């Protein structure tokens, strides 16, 4: 039986009585953002709008992006990444559970020195994929070219964010590479592993 999104009491400054708001709304007010699903256009737009709004509201207070995501679409993910780099506040990233594919890309996109993984978290990187089997031959070639450009972009970002050489990242992206939190730290995707 679904219970829906939990609601918690929240009292706005100057109000006597607390009102009940969904837990995510309450946490957003504390600058805590969550990516707990596959990246798509809808969640991308929601996270981008929250980051922009919160950065306008208070530009010197860090944002926290908690990630437990199997990955998702490339373009919406890159849009989130670009916004993280654009907004004035630092965006601290926290991996809890799994940060795979686009999730690991966003994890690496946090402010360097402020990227954290929980001790039992898993991180996975690989190359972007597409649904070639649905395309006609001409579309297939155009899509393959675009996919190659996306792979180059993602590879360059990983190189910049991790400090690893291009050949290491390129080789890792050839297949699914799963890492523990400590391995992700050694790989430069996160800076710290939380202590149990």
UniProtKB/Swiss-Prot annotation:
Record-annotated active site: 101, 126
Cellular compartments annotated: Plastid, Chloroplast stroma
PROSITE patterns documented for this protein: CLP_PROTEASE_HIS (PS00382), CLP_PROTEASE_SER (PS00381)
Keyword Protease: yes
Pfam families documented for this protein: CLP_protease (PF00574)
GO terms assigned for molecular function: ATP-dependent peptidase activity; ATPase binding; serine-type endopeptidase activity
Complexes and interactors: Component of the chloroplastic Clp protease core complex.
PANTHER family: ATP-DEPENDENT CLP PROTEASE PROTEOLYTIC SUBUNIT, CHLOROPLASTIC ATP-DEPENDENT CLP PROTEASE PROTEOLYTIC SUBUNIT 1
Protease found in the keyword field: yes
InterPro entries in UniProt: ClpP (IPR001907), ClpP/crotonase-like_dom_sf (IPR029045), ClpP/TepA (IPR023562), ClpP_His_AS (IPR033135), ClpP_Ser_AS (IPR018215)
Keywords: Chloroplast, Hydrolase, Plastid, Protease, Serine protease
GO BP, sorted A to Z: protein quality control for misfolded or incompletely synthesized proteins
Organism listed in the record: Glycine max
Family: Belongs to the peptidase S14 family.
Gene3D superfamilies registered for this protein in UniProt: 2-enoyl-CoA Hydratase, Chain A, domain 1 (3.90.226.10)
Reaction catalyzed: Hydrolysis of proteins to small peptides in the presence of ATP and magnesium. alpha-casein is the usual test substrate. In the absence of ATP, only oligopeptides shorter than five residues are hydrolyzed (such as succinyl-Leu-Tyr-|-NHMec, and Leu-Tyr-Leu-|-Tyr-Trp, in which cleavage of the -Tyr-|-Leu- and -Tyr-|-Trp bonds also occurs)
Protein name: ATP-dependent Clp protease proteolytic subunit
Cellular component, GO, one term: endopeptidase Clp complex
Function text: Cleaves peptides in various proteins in a process that requires ATP hydrolysis. Has a chymotrypsin-like activity. Plays a major role in the degradation of misfolded proteins.
Entry EC number(s): 3.4.21.92
Enzyme class: hydrolase
């Amino acid at each position: 039986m679904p219970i829906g999104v939990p609601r918690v009491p929240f009292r706005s400054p100057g109000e006597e009585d607390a009102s009940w708001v969904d837990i995510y709304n309450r946490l957003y007010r504390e600058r805590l953002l969550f990516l707990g699903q596959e990246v798509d256009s809808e969640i991308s737009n929601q996270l981008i709008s929250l980051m922009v709004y919160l950065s306008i509201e208070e530009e010197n207070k860090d944002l926290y992006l908690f990630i437990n995501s199997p990955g998702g679409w490339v373009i919406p993910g890159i849009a989130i990444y670009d916004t993280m780099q654009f907004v004035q506040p630092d965006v601290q990233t926290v991996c809890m559970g799994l940060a795979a594919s686009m999730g690991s890309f966003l994890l690496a996109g946090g402010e360097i020195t402020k990227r954290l993984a929980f001790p039992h978290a898993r991180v996975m990187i690989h190359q972007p994929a597409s649904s070639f089997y649905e395309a006609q031959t001409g579309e297939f070639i155009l899509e393959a070219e675009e996919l190659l450009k996306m792979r180059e972009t993602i590879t360059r970002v990983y190189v910049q964010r991790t400090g690893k050489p291009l050949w290491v990242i390129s080789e890792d992206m050839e297949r699914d590479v799963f890492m523990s939190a400590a391995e992700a730290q050694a790989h430069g995707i996160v800076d710290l592993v939380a202590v149990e």
